[in-house]
Amino acid sequence: MKGIAQTFRSDLLAGHVALVVGGTSGIGAAIGNALAAVGAVVTVTGATRSEVDAARDTPEFAARDAVVLDVRDDAALRAVLDDLPRLDVLVNCAGIIRRGAEHDVRIFEEVLAVNLTGTMRCCALARDKLRMSPGKPGGAIVNTASMLSFQGGALAPGYSASKGGVLQLTRSLALAYATDGIRVNAIAPGWVRTPLTQALQEDAQRSAAIVARTPLGRWAEPADVAGAVVFLCSPAASFITGAVVPVDGGYLVA
C-alpha cells in the first residue's frame, strides 16, 4: 500500500500479530493491507467463503491468512483466536446495513447482533490474548463506529443504534481494559468510496451534495481510514484510549 508505506516505517509493527474482523473488502481490507505494510502479521476474516476467496484473489491482498468467521458464533471466534500464536492488535470492522428494512424489529435485531454484539464478542473473547501481548505499547483494539454514531439515520435505525452503541462500548471497554494494558479506541468514518456506497457515488446529485458539505472537498478513500487505524495501533498512540476518531473530512462539524 503505497500511501501507508510513504507515511509510516515499514517495520513500525514488525512482529505484531493482528486480526482484522471483517477485513476482506472495503475499509477492512484496506486496514488489513495497511497493517501488513508496516510489518504486522495479519489475519483477516470474512462472513462467507466467497468473500474470503475473493479477497485472496485481489492483487493488493497482503494478509498472511483469510478465514471465514460469523461474529455471532462464539465457537467459531474461539477457533480463530486459538489459531493465532499471539495477538497484539484487534480491529473490528464486521458490519451490515439494511437500509429501508431496519424498522422491522427482526431486521433491527439482526443488524445489532452483527454490528454491536459482534464487536463486543470479539473484544471479550480476545481480551485474554491481548492482555498477554508482548508488543509495545501493549494490546490495542480499534472498533468501527460511524458518523451515524453521532446523528440519526431515518432509513437505518438499526445501523445508527448499533454504531452509537459501538461508540459507548469503546469508551466503556477503554475503562475496563486499561488495567490489562489494552487500549480501546474507535474510528468513525464518514463517506468512504467502498462497494457499500457505490450507488451514492454514481448518483451525481447526491454525491455532489456530500462533497459540497465536506470541508476537505472529496470522498474519503479506504486508505484514509486505514492510516488512522495504523496510528491508533502504533507507539505514537500509546497514551490514547477511549477515543473515537472521525475520519470524515470535517463532515460532522460542517
Can you annotate each of these PLM segments?
Residues 93-98, 250:
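Conserved NAD(P)H cofactor-binding loop of Rossmann-fold oxidoreductase domains
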Residues 178, 183, 240-242:
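Short, small/polar-rich loop/turn modules that mediate ligand/substrate recognition or access, typified
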Residues 24-25:
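Conserved glycine-rich cofactor-binding loop
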Residues 99-112, 210:
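Substrate-binding pocket helix/loop in short-chain dehydrogenase/reductase
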Residues 123, 162, 170:
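Active-site helix of classical SDR
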Residues 146:
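Residue(s) in the substrate-gating loop at a strand-loop-helix junction
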Residues 2-9, 151, 230, 241-254:
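Short C-terminal tail/terminal secondary-structure segment
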